[in-house]
Amino acid sequence: MHLLLLHGFTSHPVLTLGPLPERLKEAGWEVRQPALPGHGTRPEDLLKVRFQDWLLAAEEAYLELPEPRGVVGLSMGGLLAAHLAARHPTKALVALAPAFALKNPLAPYLHWLIPRFPGPPSIEDPELRKRNPNYPYFPTRAVLELLALMHKTPEVLPRVKARALVVEAGKDRVVKGVDRYFALLGSPRKDYLVFPESGHDLLLDRDREAVARAVRDWLLASDNYLQ
């Protein structure tokens, strides 16, 4: 199986996925980690991007992979992963803390108040938080594109038929509704895991190795089941 790994909004395209890519490679899978438009450069570049650009970039990267294919997405990447799995043959979908909805009720209005906002508290461990590789701030108008993608996602979730794993961060202070994402998935076989001590960035926080192993083991089991 060939795996596409999708990062989140404001996330570093590679480092935000922590140990996961290496664990997947060790298991024998080919992985690809594209940088979504506006990421891996500077925060202001997000102002040039619409949510359709993220969808298109993810789809292009996905279709370049040989079949059979699977997709793993973190946060916003979990939304993009669902869109891909709804449109194309997919062996497995993994959504890590998918950004079904934002916890901050002011998020839709921030662009009226301030031009930029600090990165959210996504890592609980204070020492690991100091090494957060993601954008330290983001333009508030860019959040509108994330919200637009969130608005489009519930309608595609029932069309997902791939085997699915959804992982919730027990101390997530960024997103909510992970259980709703799971409930709406049309996958006939789907599993749900919770890491109670982890913040939103599951692969950068204190349980990062355990999360990476859990995803690897679930994918191994899925690979064997589907052969």
Positions of the model-derived regions?
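Short, surface-exposed "cap/lid" segments of acyl-processing enzymes
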Residues: 1-42
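Active-site nucleophile loop of the alpha/beta-hydrolase fold
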Residues: 94-103
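Catalytic active-site module of serine/aspartate enzymes centered on a nucleophile-bearing elbow/loop
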Residues: 197-227
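Gly/Ala-rich beta-loop-alpha elbow adjacent to hydrolase catalytic centers
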Residues: 73-81
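Conserved alpha/beta-hydrolase "acid-adjacent" motif
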Residues: 173-179
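Active-site nucleophile elbow and catalytic-triad environment of alpha/beta-hydrolase enzymes
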Residues: 139-156
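Catalytic histidine neighborhood in serine/cysteine hydrolases
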Residues: 182-201
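Short beta-strand/loop motif that positions the catalytic acidic residue
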Residues: 159-160, 166-168, 172
